């Protein structure tokens, strides 16, 4: 077990972030936890509308407001089962909280910890200035097979596009792009009949954490090797609209 400091960056009070923090703390003694405040909903929607347009964003909001809460309610026991299977806990862990990890103040505080490795676990995009301030490896657990399923909900999109062989999880280095860093490891995920949009990410996270624990000693020691991605295709994904989700569920059975 390395005694070096591993800094984990995540979003405050986010379940997946806490799962990563708890999992790594139990296995590596030198973990430090840094949290970022959630982006305001207004800023998020304004940015999304500029990129995707009003109609698409309206459909995504409807999906998040109507379908996701229902899926979460119906899937609560399955999520608990997945967490237990992979040994994931989401108990609160205290840490430093910043409004933005890209601020100079946050960068200075993280540098003061002298990290041997930084693990990204659900933050906003780290900008070029942040990345240039650190010589240590910065790696990310991504819920999808990159570079084809960059962005969000890679497992769902792989199944929706009838490419189950590319439903999986990636550990990659973080660069200035969105999930475009060099691949360190990838593993396929095979959801079962009880799984859906809400449970896919938890399965991906569980497998991703197992990969991460195996990789971290080599990453810190500078022995980690770059892997060829399962496909060179590249595309950035966002949330489905409510009509996309309903159509794929009814026609193709993708939940």
Over which residues does each language-model region extend?
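One-carbon transfer enzymes
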Residues: 1-255
